[in-house]
């Protein structure tokens, strides 16, 4: 049951000049990062987390969530005016946004994207508030067996949905698990793979890894393909009429549901949500032949869904400790940095955590709406900044942010090393999110597996006799078998022979 008094208390707790300024700062930075092709929301969040060290956790979450929401929306700017999606989530927006801009309706397209992004985030935030306590109740029945399988399920889901192939995704995920074993064993106190280096006693700095994998790797990749400054089209800002917004409302509600549900599926992401919603609307439209030629319904479907995906992705992150996408994988690192352990026991640390997240999402959405409407022309100017200047700024922030956490030059070396690793992974087709998930969930998987074995006298039987554990195990086996091309071909051949 929703506690209205807790919602009111959560609202009053953020009504200070400092926190409202953090909302503005995070949203503004997010929209700018999202608008610049080549700079991702994941990179922005990973850089930001290091600068939240020393803040109160509520202030840090305000900054992070604001940047996440602003960044997801910001990708529509370059998608509409340049036909270059600022983020993968805005790729579907470009299909109809850019043709509208070519007709001189770029401002209208941007206005539609702004209002629909706001609607999608608000609608999904309400679903987040309703669904989260239900999943928490389920999570309270978890034991060591379920936690271990949940960690493995998250890694396998991410490997399946973010990599070119399941095998490559699993290689990346298990590499992350191997990296997570470096340091002192939390149970026995034995040093593992430290090679006498005291800086490795606690393993690698998670912030250094995140900034290296997502920030430095992106810088290296971008330096390999530098392009001239972008020149956005000029377009007058035109707000959609009330009649137009009411016409789009049914599409927006349906797309919000698609985005929220898709976001709650671990490893899927806003880009998938946008494409699924776009395809549904194209099929339901009375004029599907106009999609891709400047039909505003395409923008409504894509932008509502990809922004609704943001609150949706927080559901598995907070309730089960499994990231909904690459950005929430990084956000988990930020929560851990501030002493919050995502998962079923999170409410024991902070009983009102879901109400506070709900309020932060709502307020961040309002700031996104205001910034999107009033700073349209400024963000168009940002697109013209030379990419070399942006990359220099990102590099400096990466070094400063990494060093600031522990004041160790060793962490800078780790950041650079993982930046090179991240770049090489891109070149061979290995996805970064499974690696990051492996590192984040590695400790949880290892400790709970060992506890499960000890408590069951080293018997594997509880994995199949406990209902939730059995369900997770069946899901894992299904994913692995479903992606095995050899077995799939044999199954189809067997069915054909029987037919």
What residue ranges belong to the model's regions?
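Re-entrant/interfacial helical elements at transmembrane boundaries that shape
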Residues: 41-51, 79-99, 130, 173-174, ...
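A structural-propensity feature for long, helix-poor, extended segments
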Residues: 68-79, 86, 295-320, 324, ...
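Transmembrane alpha-helix interface/packing and boundary motifs in multi-pass membrane proteins
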Residues: 27-41, 70-83, 158-163, 256-266, ...
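Membrane-interface alpha-helices at helix entry/exit sites of multi-pass transporters
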Residues: 58-62, 99-116, 286-298, 326-329, ...
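Membrane-embedded alpha-helical segments of transport systems
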Residues: 69-74, 115-127, 135, 179, ...
